[in-house]
Amino acid sequence: METVVVMVAGLVDHDVAVRVWRDRPGSVLVRHVAAETCVRRWVDGVATDIDLLHGCASCTVREDLRELLAALKGHTVVLHLDPLLEPDAVRRKLGVDVECVITVLDAATWLDDALGDASMVSDQRTVAQVVVAQAEAADVLVLQGDADERTLAVLDRLAPGAHRCTPETVVVRKSTRPRLMPLTPECGVSTAVFTADRPFHPARLNDALDSLLDGTVVRSRGRLWVADEPDVALHLESAGCGLHVGEGGPLGGRTTQIVAITLGEPDSITAAFTEALLTDDELSFVDSIRKLAI
């Protein structure tokens, strides 16, 4: 009999994990909270302090969860994640099948957090990177308080197919697949889509990235072809005013694709990245250099 895992995430205080646990007789409620010198773990309300491994709270939680899930094989485990943890990151590191990811958010403040540049106290991430990653991983979004239409339109694009409910009506439900992001503008929320079949100029690309950091973009993702990296694609990801660009594996097809959820003008984003592409003269020069190298 396989272990069933339900993850409950969220940066806000909530009792949703307890509600899910109570609604599933025989399930086990697990929660970890990091402290300065240890990690406190609760299993069905019984607390245990665990010494930090190498001074790393996340490493300690990960290793303890591996052992716990092995010991609880065949059970339903309701995993109340530490507020700072992102469900997809936990799922990848643990290598477990998850029946449902439930994310709890403050409907009144979530969008401001998702657009902002506030930093987390505990690590190098921004608050936006945490709350956006938690929301987009959700099969079920639990809204504490009333959300305005603009927030709901953003969530429709960030987590399409996710079921929305309140803490009192929470259910464990796998979202429908495939998740198709709406492309039609709604309540001032748009989806910018940029594609190109020529590489970026590295310096101009750096300038174009600023179009994603003006406080109107909730989330962007992309796979970039840059002229000085002819064999490697770069992976782009931003949330609010936090951005990361890193190696994304072999280039494969020589194309660029960027998708951004924005409350601003999508045309300004596509225009900025269009201006960052190599011109015809630059492209001819690069091609001639490559031929000489061969």
Language-model segments: which ranges?
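Hydrophobic side chains in well-ordered alpha-helices
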Residues: 16-17, 68, 90, 151-154, ...
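Short, flexible beta-strand-to-coil junctions
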Residues: 10-12, 224-226, 263-265
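Short, solvent-exposed amphipathic alpha-helical segments in soluble enzyme
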Residues: 20-24, 44-45, 94, 156-158, ...
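C-terminal accessory "lid"/substrate-recognition subdomains
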Residues: 25, 34-38, 103, 107-112, ...
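Nucleotide-state-sensitive switch-loop elements of NTP-binding domains
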Residues: 2-102, 107-112, 120
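Generic C-terminus detector
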Residues: 252-294
